[in-house]
Amino acid sequence: MDLVELDYLSALEDLTFNSKPIIHTLTYIAQENEPYAISIVNAIEKHIQKCPPNCKLPALYLLDSISKNLGAPYTYFFGLHLFSTFMSAYTVVEPRLRLKLDQLLATWKQRPPNSSSLEPVFSPIVTAKIENALLKYKSTILRHQSPLLANTSISSFSAPIDANINSYSSFSDPASSYKPSLPSVPFGFQHISGTSPSPGFITLDSLLSDVNRMIVTEQARFIKNPYDNMAKKRFEILLQLKNVLSSSALPYDQLLAIKNQLAQLEKPASPSTSSVATSAPSVPSALSSISSTPFMKPSIPSTIPTIPSAYSASVSSQPPLTHSYVHPGPQSHKYSLSSGPPASLYNANALTPEESSSIDSLFANLQAAGLVPPSAGGKSQGPQASCTEAVSLTADIDLSKSSLATPRPKLSSLLYENYSNQCANCGRRYGNDPESRKELDKHSDWHFRINKRIRESSLHGINRCWFVMEEEWVNSKEEEDLITETAQEIEEQRQKQMESVRSQYVLTPLDPIAASEPCPICQEKFQSVWHEEAEVWVFMNAVEEEGRIFHATCLQEVRPSENKHSNTNTSTQNLAEAAVSSNIKNATGDASKDSQPDVQNLLQGIDIQSILQALGKRKERDDSMDSMSSKVIKQESK
């Protein structure tokens, strides 16, 4: 018994009444753990056998929900022992609950709701077997209740019984109701007589159900033995075939060819003569109790052969079991996904040369029909091979607790080969191609900047005023990994930007009053200097906006870092207007007190000495130009 079966059994203990949320949750768990369908089916069947009679109906409702909503492979595994599971519950529940079980059985003979498949939930062979047993059971009860029905034949209540259907004598005692059943044959291979049935019309749904069943078998085999390359190859081919059947509409002749190839693929090597000889005598002994049941003797017509002979005829004509993981009874040896199988079962899983040749022939026929690309079967070279290997290795991985606990050494080697370079700080992995190495270098530089920032921030505390403003944070872009400039380069760029701001100038106003006005922001007066290139008197580090002169650096500090929002510009202008208006008021107040202007205050911002020197230089240059022009004129006259 594996961990999945134990966990699901513990979850089934809460299903003590007909609760739709609990049934829905358990159905969802079964859907998530579909690779372990055998364990979940084992748990449900054990729960139905051991739970009290009042809890059997909710458990059968859970079985019904899983079968109708999930379908294969659960319907296949449930169908193997559905007869014993259903009848063991039917014989012990109250009479009022048997009507609900009859209604439940009627729904199993119809196709599942919201399903495109026309096939019923369970095989008609299984449901007919249960119906015949129910009719016999009800007729037996009626004979005991009414003496008039004592001599009534059961054949008057039921249709003719199949030769290989077991009688219901084993269910008279509830304690012994779940005994190990006889080896059952998959639904597609069951016979009524020794002759094989004629193949019916092949549909896409039936072919998909066969492929799904074989996928589950090969997946369980591959999980049990990860180093079985042939099982892995079969699993990959079946997955490709399922994708082709699901995505394309194939003609009937191709469906028939695929069906024949699947039938050849399912046929294992015939068992040895000794194994058949040792197992054959056990069949009549196992059926002796069934054939000797008192009330079953008059029910079987004389034209139908006895059960042991019919069974031996069907065994001699039928092919061996194709499903290596046939669900056993509770008293037999358990084969779970976590415990090792017996030696005989392990030998049965080993592929023979006949199976290997059938795999190759199936793959060759699929390639010839154009259903599988030619590169899918061979071993490709280069990156495509690693991608194909990764897809094949991760096909059966499920993000569940039990699946993640399964060791997969091939996946580890695949990770180390494809992502060989690892970051020493955080463990992040990169490939070995040039682009991946560049990404690793950028990632290492990012670690260096972050570590340096952490070391610097640990030396001093963090002040709230250092945080960026809300608008600046909204307009900023996080490009930390893309920054490659050093701190020195950033400082040089900032110095160049400030030099370009300080190099702005405004011509010195001719009006002495306007020239003496200070900056509206810092209230410092401007210094008039001579500009050599423009050859005029200017105010350096100054800009003029709306008739007012500002320091360019002051205006740069007052404005936001990005001149994109008009509201911030308006607030700056309002601040400047307020400063200018206050200065004007002060000036008008002083003028009212003293009507005569103060000459010293007017000439305070003007460098008179520099002006006189510049005028002298200009006069000398003009005189030299006049003298040179006069000499040129005299020479021309001569």
Curated annotation (Swiss-Prot):
<dbReference type="Pfam" id="PF11526">
    <property type="entry name" value="Pfc11_Clp1_ID"/>
</dbReference>
<feature type="region of interest" description="Disordered">
    <location>
        <begin position="318"/>
        <end position="338"/>
    </location>
</feature>
<feature type="region of interest" description="Disordered">
    <location>
        <begin position="615"/>
        <end position="638"/>
    </location>
</feature>
<dbReference type="GO" id="GO:0000785">
    <property type="term" value="C:chromatin"/>
</dbReference>
<dbReference type="GO" id="GO:0005848">
    <property type="term" value="C:mRNA cleavage stimulating factor complex"/>
</dbReference>
<dbReference type="GO" id="GO:0180010">
    <property type="term" value="P:co-transcriptional mRNA 3'-end processing, cleavage and polyadenylation pathway"/>
</dbReference>
<dbReference type="GO" id="GO:0006369">
    <property type="term" value="P:termination of RNA polymerase II transcription"/>
</dbReference>
<dbReference type="InterPro" id="IPR008942">
    <property type="entry name" value="ENTH_VHS"/>
</dbReference>
<dbReference type="GO" id="GO:0000993">
    <property type="term" value="F:RNA polymerase II complex binding"/>
</dbReference>
<dbReference type="GO" id="GO:0099122">
    <property type="term" value="F:RNA polymerase II C-terminal domain binding"/>
</dbReference>
<dbReference type="GO" id="GO:0033620">
    <property type="term" value="C:Mei2 nuclear dot complex"/>
</dbReference>
<dbReference type="InterPro" id="IPR054127">
    <property type="entry name" value="Pcf11_C"/>
</dbReference>
<dbReference type="InterPro" id="IPR006569">
    <property type="entry name" value="CID_dom"/>
</dbReference>
<dbReference type="InterPro" id="IPR047415">
    <property type="entry name" value="Pcf11_CID"/>
</dbReference>
<dbReference type="InterPro" id="IPR021605">
    <property type="entry name" value="Pcf11_Clp1-ID"/>
</dbReference>
<dbReference type="GO" id="GO:0005634">
    <property type="term" value="C:nucleus"/>
</dbReference>
<protein>
    <recommendedName>
        <fullName>Uncharacterized protein C4G9.04c</fullName>
    </recommendedName>
</protein>
<dbReference type="GO" id="GO:0005737">
    <property type="term" value="C:cytoplasm"/>
</dbReference>
<dbReference type="InterPro" id="IPR045154">
    <property type="entry name" value="PCF11-like"/>
</dbReference>
<dbReference type="GO" id="GO:0071920">
    <property type="term" value="C:cleavage body"/>
</dbReference>
<dbReference type="Pfam" id="PF04818">
    <property type="entry name" value="CID"/>
</dbReference>
<dbReference type="Pfam" id="PF21936">
    <property type="entry name" value="Pcf11_C"/>
</dbReference>
<feature type="domain" description="CID">
    <location>
        <begin position="1"/>
        <end position="138"/>
    </location>
</feature>
<dbReference type="GO" id="GO:0005849">
    <property type="term" value="C:mRNA cleavage factor complex"/>
</dbReference>
<dbReference type="GO" id="GO:0003729">
    <property type="term" value="F:mRNA binding"/>
</dbReference>
